[in-house]
């Protein structure tokens, strides 16, 4: 039977001495994963900007003047070309995001065709398209979609300070529709929205106490975009962020914990500590939605320093020429990639 985390138990994890917490998280990580491998995903915007929602952190909202260039739906061939390059660069999962409140029925054949084509390449697929009903979720699942991303963002109590155009319960209903369809769930949150420690505790409790824990949990650090209401929020203290990663690993031991948006603001030492705390997945590529992502070459150099191997590569250290070949093949158009915090 899955453990149900209580408020007191979760608070106690946050109160643990830092190194004791790190030790426990690393122990839990090693029970369930190879500590020297990392899962790599690439995220592509298939429709950018003009979103009707009012998420206060998001440059894709039509309500804020952020200078984001609006783009229509990409052609299928453009998407397939990007997916091939992502696979050649070491990604095992191709994620696609559209700036919608929810997909329309007219969009479903387009989405289903993309999923089937990318699956033929041998990659896992993930989409983030906004709210889904059960019929839409079933169609995506039948097309072969492996994961659906729908973040909770923050705690139920703090949520209305961030978003008013979609309720917390609607998010939970979408996650239920995704799970019921047979797809895997990708759901996490954003740190740095102005939330208190209690909100971080409640967010991790909500995620870990879902009927089945998410297979993938992206932990985003707020990317402060000029023009959004959160452009001047305080920076997140790195050790607070590392602590959240560690607690997430302990509470969701079999989930992939992903370093997502905001990673470009972290130095190598902070990222290494996050990996030590149990993070074992990243978004790799030029851009995440609308914010910078660390350059591919730098990522691969960091992997080499830490002896981390992409999950779909051989489980031995890559040789120098293998790293160079991956770097060479990773040149993808930067204007197609965007920020995971907005999904």
Curated annotation (Swiss-Prot):
Pathway(s) where this gene product acts: Cofactor biosynthesis; biotin biosynthesis; biotin from 7,8-diaminononanoate: step 2/2
Entry note: cofactor: Binds 1 [4Fe-4S] cluster. The cluster is coordinated with 3 cysteines and an exchangeable S-adenosyl-L-methionine. Binds 1 [2Fe-2S] cluster. The cluster is coordinated with 3 cysteines and 1 arginine.
Catalytic activity from the UniProt record: (4R,5S)-dethiobiotin + (sulfur carrier)-SH + 2 reduced [2Fe-2S]-[ferredoxin] + 2 S-adenosyl-L-methionine = (sulfur carrier)-H + biotin + 2 5'-deoxyadenosine + 2 L-methionine + 2 oxidized [2Fe-2S]-[ferredoxin]
CDD domains: Radical_SAM
Binding sites annotated in the UniProt record for [2Fe-2S] cluster: 95, 126, 186, 258
All residue ranges annotated as the Radical SAM core domain in the record: 36-254
InterPro entries listed in its UniProt record: Aldolase_TIM, BATS_dom, Biotin_synth/BioAB, Biotin_synthase, Elp3/MiaA/NifB-like_rSAM, rSAM
Cofactor dependency: [4Fe-4S] cluster; [2Fe-2S] cluster
UniProt-listed Gene3D superfamilies: Aldolase class I
Keywords, sorted A to Z: 2Fe-2S, 4Fe-4S, Biotin biosynthesis, Iron, Iron-sulfur, Metal-binding, S-adenosyl-L-methionine, Transferase
Binding positions for [4Fe-4S] cluster per the UniProt entry: 51, 55, 58
Protein name: Biotin synthase
The organism of origin for this protein: Buchnera aphidicola subsp. Acyrthosiphon pisum (strain Tuc7)
Gene: bioB
């Amino acid at each position: 039977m899955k453990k149900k985390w209580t408020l007191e138990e979760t608070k106690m994890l946050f109160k643990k001495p830092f190194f004791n917490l790190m030790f426990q998280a690393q122990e839990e990580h090693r029970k369930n994963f190879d500590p020297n491998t990392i899962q790599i995903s690439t995220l592509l915007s298939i429709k950018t900007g003009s979103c009707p929602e009012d998420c206060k952190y998001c440059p894709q909202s039509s309500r804020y003047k952020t200078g984001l260039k609006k783009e229509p739906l990409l052609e299928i061939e453009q998407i397939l070309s990007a997916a091939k390059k992502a696979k050649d660069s070491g990604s095992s999962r191709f994620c696609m995001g559209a700036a919608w409140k929810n997909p329309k029925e007219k969009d479903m054949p387009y989405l289903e065709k993309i999923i089937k084509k990318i699956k033929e390449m041998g990659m896992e697929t993930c989409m983030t398209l906004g709210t889904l009903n059960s019929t839409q979720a079933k169609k995506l699942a039948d097309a072969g979609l492996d994961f659906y991303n729908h973040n909770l963002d923050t705690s139920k109590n703090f949520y209305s300070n961030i978003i008013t155009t979609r309720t917390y319960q609607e998010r939970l209903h979408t996650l239920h529709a995704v799970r019921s369809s047979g797809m895997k769930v990708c759901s996490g949150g954003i740190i740095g929205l102005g939330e208190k420690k209690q909100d971080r505790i409640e967010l991790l409790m909500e995620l870990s106490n879902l009927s089945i824990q998410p297979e993938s949990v992206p932990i985003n650090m707020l990317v402060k975009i000029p023009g959004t209401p959160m452009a001047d929020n305080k920076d997140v203290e790195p050790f607070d962020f590392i602590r959240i990663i560690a607690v997430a690993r302990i509470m969701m031991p079999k989930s992939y914990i992903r370093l997502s948006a905001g990673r470009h603001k972290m130095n190598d030492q902070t990222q290494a500590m996050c990996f030590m705390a149990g993070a074992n997945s990243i978004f790799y590529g030029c851009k995440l939605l609308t914010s910078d992502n660390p350059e591919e070459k730098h990522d691969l150099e960091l992997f080499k320093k830490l002896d981390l191997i992409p999950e779909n590569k051989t489980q031995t250290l890559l040789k120098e020429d293998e790293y160079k070949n991956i770097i060479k093949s990773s040149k993808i158009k930067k204007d197609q990639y965007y920020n995971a915090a907005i999904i």
